[in-house]
């Protein structure tokens, strides 16, 4: 009998997610059972952990398991566990809301493309709600460990606008999820269908999955029912690598991550010696939708001596590897370990160092063995990996080898050029790795700063991700060669510079008075005015000194709401350009001023992508064209 019954409305995001999920995941509907068994496994893990400090929570029932049964007459399928259970407050929190930041933004990003919806929902992790793919009503009966029998809770919903919650009496600890199957989903009331799903998705979890099966005499006569263990229930990571198939590794990844897609690669290692631990690391094939959300949880599952301790133990991976999934099972940490203890622990630091190295080696091997697959990884996680040089000085060279860039070597915006590729193609006498940063690939590819490099056939890296400028403030060299921006006023090409130095010097002298006129006109608005011979088709550019903040870095500061120091540019004029020659000959000061201003505005527009006063620029063009 139930008491204290109330009907509550779903959080709006739950309603939207339920509708999307029912339609988008229908083609792979059997995953609901995998999700419910995974939740039951998590509940058992949490009870084991709490019972370390309070063994009485077991209350004489320490053999944890998942039980599956069905009733053909009633059309119900039940998934039960004797794990941690839930209180009334926890039921409302966990089953009536989605406690994830950015949920609204995630749902807004979903379109009408079912394949895309399915992929994104899979990344989100649907868990319990997947029951509504096959059920038109779901009933949950639960009782939290340590609570008396009269503290059971009933939750029930048809997956529409609301749900009912009430107090009930429940004799046993744990949770029963009862699915009232739709008329066209009765295939899941079949013992062999269920055996197949359990074998496919849940063979690897370290918890027995039992099913109520019919028992027969030798003559084939039914004599009753019995609970039969269906899965192997050996924790997969404790088995020898030679015994585990690729399919088992893939399904275990889906169990761990609640991802629907196969992982890109994995590494399973058992380490003995000064430290004893087993790690199973996965690289996902798709980035989670909230990878760049600051509240996004990441990290490995932590086990100590095969006992689950915590999810999302971020202390074992640096932030730039937050996309890695998997687990670590350590013999060297205490069973009562907490997040606080992990923060300042020598064992943790040693494990973090080893797991970071292992992860980078996985990526290095992938890049070497399968460039196409590595490009798939780079498109999903390249931006995150670019955070590495700033975070991890010890592994900076290893990270640098994994970075990929667009380049003038290819007529493509695809980031597929490594620094090793670049160095192998450097010109004789070239001492630096040259790059340019811009708001977009198109802006970088068409920058006037490239003109001399194109003329001389010198490769330039084209960087257009917002993080690039910040990354390069930490990644200043590779293989002993400095990385140098081609937009700097004091750029020195060394042995690659033009040989016509005498001719250029004479030309510069003939333009001396012109340069002085421009300096007088512009005054303190620019740092310096000078002639340049690194342009071929463009009359003028602006550039910054080595000790100055670059344009892209200034934009990065502004976007982050940080104060931006004033950037004073060097104004460089091309004495070989017909327009500069024409302006140098203008005697009328007003007309001269208009043309110089126009040249400066053009250069600023090419460098920054915008002007402080675009109306004045347009007015000036109209005036000079009229």
From Swiss-Prot:
Residues 556-626 are annotated as: C. GO terms for molecular function: ATP binding; ATP hydrolysis activity; ATP-dependent protein folding chaperone; unfolded protein binding. Residues 340-555 are annotated as: B. It comes from the Bacteria. GO terms for cellular component: cytoplasm. Residues 1-339 are annotated as: A. SMART domains: HATPase_c. It is found in: Cytoplasm. This is Chaperone protein HtpG. The gene is htpG.
């Amino acid at each position: 009998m139930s008491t204290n019954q109330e009907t509550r409305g779903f959080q709006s995001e739950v309603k939207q997610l339920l509708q999307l999920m029912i339609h988008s995941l229908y083609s792979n509907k059997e995953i609901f059972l995998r999700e419910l068994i995974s939740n039951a496994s998590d509940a058992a893990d949490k009870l084991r952990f709490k019972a370390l400090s309070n063994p009485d929570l077991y209350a004489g029932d320490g053999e944890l398991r998942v039980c599956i049964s069905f009733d053909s007459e009633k059309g119900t399928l039940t998934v039960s566990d004797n794990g941690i259970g839930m209180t009334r407050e926890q039921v409302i929190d966990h089953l009536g809301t989605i406690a994830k930041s950015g949920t609204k933004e995630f749902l807004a990003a979903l379109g009408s493309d079912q394949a895309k919806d399915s992929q994104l929902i899979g990344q989100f992790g649907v868990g319990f709600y997947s029951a509504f793919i096959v059920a038109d009503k779901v009933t949950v009966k639960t009782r939290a460990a340590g609570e008396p029998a009269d503290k059971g809770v009933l939750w029930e919903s048809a997956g529409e606008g609301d749900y009912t919650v009430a107090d009930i009496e429940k004799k046993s600890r744990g949770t029963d999820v009862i699915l009232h199957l739709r008329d066209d989903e009765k295939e899941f009331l079949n013992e062999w269908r269920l055996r197949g799903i359990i074998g496919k998705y849940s063979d690897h979890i370290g918890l027995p999955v039992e099913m109520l099966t019919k028992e027969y005499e030798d003559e084939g006569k039914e004599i009753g029912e019995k609970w039969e263990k269906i899965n192997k229930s050996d924790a997969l990571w404790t088995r020898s690598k030679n015994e585990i198939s690729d399919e088992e590794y893939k399904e275990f990844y889906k169990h761990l991550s609640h991802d629907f897609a196969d992982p890109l690669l994995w590494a399973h290692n058992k380490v003995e010696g000064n430290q004893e631990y087993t790690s199973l690391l996965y690289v996902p094939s798709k980035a989670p939708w909230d990878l760049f959300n600051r509240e996004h949880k990441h990290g490995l599952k932590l086990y100590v001596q095969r006992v689950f301790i915590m999810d999302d133990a971020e202390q074992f991976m640096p932030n730039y590897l937050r996309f890695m999934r998997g687990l670590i099972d350590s013999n060297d940490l205490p069973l009562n370990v907490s997040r606080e203890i992990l923060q300042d622990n020598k064992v943790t630091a040693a494990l973090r160092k080893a797991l970071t190295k292992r992860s980078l080696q996985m990526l290095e091997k992938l890049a070497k063995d399968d460039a196409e697959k590595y490009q798939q990884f780079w498109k999903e996680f390249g931006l995150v990996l670019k955070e590495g040089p700033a975070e991890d000085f010890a592994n900076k060279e290893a990270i640098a080898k994994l970075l990929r860039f667009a380049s003038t070597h290819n007529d493509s915006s695809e980031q597929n050029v490594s620094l090793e590729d670049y160095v192998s193609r450097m010109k004789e006498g070239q001492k630096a790795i040259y790059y340019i940063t811009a708001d977009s690939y198109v802006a970088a590819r068409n920058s006037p700063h490239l003109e001399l490099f194109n003329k001389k056939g010198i490769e330039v890296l084209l960087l257009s991700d917002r993080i690039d400028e910040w990354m390069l403030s930490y990644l200043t060299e590779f293989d002993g060669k400095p990385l140098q921006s081609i937009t700097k006023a004091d750029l020195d090409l060394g042995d690659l510079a033009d040989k016509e130095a005498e001719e250029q010097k004479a030309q510069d002298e003939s333009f001396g008075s012109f340069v002085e006129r421009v300096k007088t006109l512009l005054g303190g608005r620019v740092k310096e005015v000078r002639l340049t011979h690194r342009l071929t088709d463009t009359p003028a550019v602006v550039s910054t000194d080595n000790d100055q903040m670059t344009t892209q870095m200034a934009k990065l500061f502004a976007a982050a709401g940080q104060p931006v120091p004033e950037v004073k540019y060097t104004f460089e004029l091309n004495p070989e350009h017909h327009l500069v020659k024409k302006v140098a000959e203008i005697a009328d000061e007003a007309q001269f001023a208009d043309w110089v201003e126009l040249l400066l505005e053009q250069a600023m527009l090419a460098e920054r992508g915008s002007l402080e006063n675009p109306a004045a620029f347009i007015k000036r063009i109209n005036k000079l064209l009229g």
